[in-house]
Amino acid sequence: MGTNKPVVIGIAGGSGSGKTSVTKAIFDHFQGHSILILEQDYYYKDQSHLPMEERLKTNYDHPLAFDNDLLIEHLHQLLAYKMIEKPVYDYTLHTRSEEVIPVEPKDVIILEGILVLEDPRLCELMDIKLFVDTDADLRILRRMQRDIKERGRTMDSVIEQYVNVVRPMHNQFIEPSKKFADIIIPEGGQNHVAIDIMVTKIATILEEKVNL
């Protein structure tokens, strides 16, 4: 482990923008190094105190759906090179699972999620802030493909959710958070030039921290 605090990279962007592809590309490049991925999706609020009919109304694209207090606490622990117990969210029960995942601290932390740039407290902890910017038509097509294939959703339900929830929340919260990004990556995981530049920048920051 390094003697300096870890490097934190925030990667935000709308659903289906290619955040995960960008995250994986960066992670794969540093494979074998001390690096971890922390997904904001794991930090939805515990709703075990609510009846199921209330849980079903959860808007997962709204900032208030996330337990950022716990996420920030865990980030501070990782920055101090302390282990955390990452929560697990059960989407079938619409609440937090009793299961936790032990996460060892690493020298590079990739924080990925639709709204990681929306909370100034999270932004303050980041060394590099990225926003993956992809055309809305492509994002809905990717989301449709994912939800139908992986989550057993119907096309009608995906479209209805997109029109009533995903698009309004994107326009209200996700898109405005783009202004806090240091770097905007168009075309998501297909933008190999931008990813290569990011990899070089991260390597430079790591080298600077080692030489301090």
Curated annotation (Swiss-Prot):
GO biological process, one term: CTP salvage
Cellular location(s): Cytoplasm
Transmembrane intervals: none
The keyword Nucleus appears for this protein: no
Domain of life of the organism encoding this protein: Bacteria
Pfam annotation, one family: PRK
Binding-site positions, ATP: G13, G14, S15, G16, S17, G18, K19, T20
Catalysed reactions, as listed in the record: uridine + ATP = UMP + ADP + H(+); cytidine + ATP = CMP + ADP + H(+)
HAMAP family: Uridine_kinase
Similarity section: Belongs to the uridine kinase family.
Listed name of the protein: Uridine kinase
Lineage per the UniProt record: Bacteria, Bacillati, Bacillota, Bacilli, Bacillales
